[in-house]
């Protein structure tokens, strides 16, 4: 029963549309009406500003991605519970109940989960992404690697 509550809570935390809130608070816009239309840090970067993307990224990675998985690891001693809470947070980010099931792509939230599950892999992933971006000036391909 505790795990079910944690998974539902993880979905609700993951559903917090922080990119939407940043767009509303800073420029009084619905970020979904601009750029890619997604509720994510990349769209905030492109349409609100770089300065606004950093808190958006931090919230997505640490509050939405890492925190639910970390708390699940403390409350339960079940690795599947940690993964279930992390996936619920990603699903919440991608299909947020608060904004009629629209959302982002879940990359930052999934990265937050990866930090909890295997921080060494997360560091390697960031390294490959940064190197790919420096060489090719495009992160789209490198984020997936």
In which residue ranges do the predicted regions lie?
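N-terminal signal-anchor transmembrane alpha helix
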Residues: 1-27
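Interfacial segments of multi-pass membrane proteins
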Residues: 45-49, 72-75, 92, 107-136
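Cytosolic, membrane-interface loops and tails of multi-pass inner-membrane proteins
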Residues: 21-53, 102-103
């Amino acid at each position: 029963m505790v795990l079910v509550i944690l998974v539902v809570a993880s979905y609700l935390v993951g559903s917090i549309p922080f990119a939407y809130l940043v767009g509303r608070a800073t420029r009084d816009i619905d970020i979904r009406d601009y750029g890619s239309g997604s509720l994510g840090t990349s769209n905030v970067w492109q349409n609100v500003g770089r300065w606004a993307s950093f808190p958006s990224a931090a919230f997505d990675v640490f509050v939405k991605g890492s925190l639910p998985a970390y708390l699940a690891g403390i409350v339960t001693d079940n690795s599947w519970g940690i993964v279930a809470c992390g996936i619920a947070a990603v699903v919440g980010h991608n299909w947020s109940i608060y904004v009629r099931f629209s959302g982002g792509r879940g990359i930052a939230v999934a990265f937050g989960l990866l930090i909890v599950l295997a921080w060494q892999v997360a560091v390697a992933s960031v390294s490959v992404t940064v190197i790919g971006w420096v060489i090719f000036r495009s992160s789209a391909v490198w984020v997936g690697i």
